[in-house]
């Protein structure tokens, strides 16, 4: 790994320098595995590296967009404490002097013990956290949110029950020195409220 920043990575693979339009060191490990497999299959090195250089992140996995004002939004599926920590660790390595704002939630009718851990991790690796809903299902979303904020040691967070509003308001108020992470849904294009699947897409918002 030669360079690692918000525009991607410059890496040396088999004595060839290539630029990757993806972020996150764990993505590099996946790419190296692909390259090793291509060598086993005896695929031409230059052809393999050319294909690898064009790889895009999977939808909703450290998928990012740079706005017209220079701020950066990242959407990721991370919905467990471990996954959230991995994503935020990757972002912190390339943040520079940017601040990190994270939008998080936790699913309803699922393991309640992870909720305060989500709050703890988000607080530890972010400058500010917005706690919102994420597939509340048959639970009251505010009960889920209250479980999450039990993991906070400070009041460096806010609550916005409406996920769409949380994202819109955050986008309106960030500048070119801010990275906004929207975690939890990634590729999903719905919110599960009760037994209903309501259209919702973090990336499109």
Task: Indicate residue ranges for each PLM-predicted region.
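A short glycine/serine-rich beta->alpha loop
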Residues: 17-25
């Amino acid at each position: 790994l030669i360079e690692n920043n918000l525009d991607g990575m410059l890496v040396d693979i088999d004595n060839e320098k290539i630029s990757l339009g993806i972020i996150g060191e764990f993505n590099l490990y996946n790419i190296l595995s692909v390259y090793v497999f291509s060598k086993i299959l005896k695929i031409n090195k230059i052809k393999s590296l050319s294909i690898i250089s064009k790889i895009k992140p999977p939808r909703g996995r450290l998928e990012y967009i740079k706005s017209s004002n220079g701020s950066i939004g990242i959407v990721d599926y991370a919905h467990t404490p471990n996954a959230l920590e991995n994503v935020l660790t990757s972002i912190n390595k390339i943040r520079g002097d940017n601040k990190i704002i994270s939008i998080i939630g936790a699913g309803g009718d699922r393991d309640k013990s992870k909720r305060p851990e989500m709050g703890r991790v988000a607080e530890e690796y972010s400058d500010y956290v917005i706690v919102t809903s994420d597939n509340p299902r048959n639970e009251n979303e505010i009960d889920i949110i209250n479980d999450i904020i039990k993991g906070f040691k400070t009041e460096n967070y806010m609550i916005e029950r409406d996920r769409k509003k949380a994202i819109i308001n955050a986008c309106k108020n960030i500048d070119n020195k801010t990275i906004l992470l929207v975690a939890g849904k990634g590729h999903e294009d719905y919110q599960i409220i009760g037994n209903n699947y309501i259209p919702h897409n973090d990336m499109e918002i």
